[in-house]
A protein has these predicted regions:
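Hydrophobic transmembrane alpha-helices and their helix-loop junctions in integral membrane proteins
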Residues: 1-169
């Protein structure tokens, strides 16, 4: 949809051409689909259901790699798209920040409670990862330099620590 409006998928070209078509319904729909895709890849609550099973049933060596990289790459790419491709007035005109804050807070609270009960350690760490992703998205949803910086610091520390925890399992 974004390609049909702009004629390109290059991030720099999109950043230059999107202000001209920011008011189009197609652009808003494309933006929504992109954000939903990122939410799925991030395992953002409530679109997180694939992550606990993937971490639990994958071989331990694969789980270490998945836990350290898969969702973190999605956070980084989402940040790039939000802050370099789409114009800031476009993003602020959508309910993206509010949805990130709500889903981040819900993910933190609900998956932290769920993580307290599983008997399988890998499943516990998977639900803990969903909660940590909630913290990262909450920082992004604040739409401030401090929030984004905190999210990036948390992203790197979570990648290192969660990978190490899965190595220990």
């Amino acid at each position: 949809l974004i390609y049909s409006e702009t004629g390109t998928l290059n991030m720099m070209d999109l950043a230059a051409r999107l202000p001209e078509v920011a008011d189009q319904r197609t652009t808003h729909t494309g933006f929504a689909f992109i954000m939903i895709g990122f939410a799925l890849k991030l395992a953002l609550f409530p679109l997180h259901l694939w992550l606990p099973n993937a971490y639990t049933y994958a071989p331990s060596a694969i789980t270490v790699f998945l836990a350290a990289t898969a969702t973190k790459v999605a956070v980084y790419v989402m940040l790039r798209v939000l802050f370099t491709v789409f114009p800031q007035d476009f993003v602020s005109a959508t309910p993206t920040d509010e949805l990130f804050i709500l889903s981040g807070m819900a993910g933190i609270l609900i998956t932290s409670v769920i993580a307290a009960y599983p008997a399988n350690v890998k499943r516990l760490l998977a639900y803990s990862s969903v909660a940590q992703i909630g913290y990262m998205v909450l920082g992004i949803g604040l739409a401030s330099a401090t929030g984004v910086t905190a999210s990036l610091v948390h992203l790197f520390s979570h990648a290192l620590m969660k990978g190490a925890r899965f190595m220990a399992v």
